[in-house]
């Protein structure tokens, strides 16, 4: 696997994913009973946007960088999810430096309560070691494991309620999307009361439309598509 999220951390797609993640957890927090959060591709848990990788891509400049540069008056009037997101980023930067940026596991643990639990997968050994170094929370169980088989082994959790964040690297999209549909069908069958959030890149609109049609044909209830496009579909 060649994918390294350190090149893409904090970009516009990360911003959208993390704001939505926090909003989903907020909804789960509305009920008293505990829940389980599962992250299938946890990554390093925390990133440094001052590294050569992040600086080389510069993707964060059109993501988190633009938000933190906004006037405080604009931030105060932003939607609740955006305010919560920015507060977590600001707190991390106060503790780890202005280049620090949280990964999905970090955002999730900040959005969860003490009674909730997390299961986080990461199969790349070097990235998993970074995850172990960065995430030291008693609520989180870390697994160096392929989530495509690991997810089905840990659901349904004893908490009954919960959220699964699925964010694979999509290195071979023609293979990854069909595999993702199969995973979701199997996971939903085991845990029909779970919430499954799937992140995917929009590089080939026709491929995305095929994926979405296949998902609707699965019969999985209450599907919602949330997309953000900052460039036209025909942009090279």
Regions found by a protein language model. Give the residues of each.
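Class I S-adenosyl-L-methionine-dependent methyltransferase catalytic core
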Residues: 1-236
């Amino acid at each position: 696997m060649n994918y390294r999220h350190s090149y893409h951390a904090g970009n516009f797609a990360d911003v959208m994913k993390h704001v939505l993640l926090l909003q989903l957890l907020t909804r789960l927090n509305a009920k008293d009973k505990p829940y389980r959060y599962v992250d299938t591709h946890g990554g390093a848990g925390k990133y440094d946007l001052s590294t050569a990788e992040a600086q080389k891509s510069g993707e964060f400049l059109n993501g988190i960088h633009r938000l933190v540069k906004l006037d405080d008056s604009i931030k105060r009037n932003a939607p609740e999810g955006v305010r919560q997101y920015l507060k977590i980023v600001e707190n991390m930067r106060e503790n780890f430096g202005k280049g620090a940026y949280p990964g999905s596991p970090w955002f999730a643990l900040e959005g969860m309560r003490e009674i909730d639990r997390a299961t986080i997968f990461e199969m790349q050994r070097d990235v998993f070691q970074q995850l172990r170094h960065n995430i030291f929370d008693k609520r989180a169980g870390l697994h160096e494991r392929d989530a495509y088989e690991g997810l089905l082994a840990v659901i349904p959790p004893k908490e009954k309620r919960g959220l699964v964040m699925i964010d694979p690297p999509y290195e071979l999209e023609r293979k990854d999307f069909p595999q993702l549909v199969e995973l979701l069908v199997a996971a939903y069958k085991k845990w029909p009361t779970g919430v499954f959030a799937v992140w995917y890149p929009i590089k080939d609109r026709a491929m995305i439309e095929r994926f979405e049609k296949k998902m609707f044909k699965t019969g999985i209830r209450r599907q919602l598509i949330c997309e953000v496009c900052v460039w036209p579909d025909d942009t090279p």
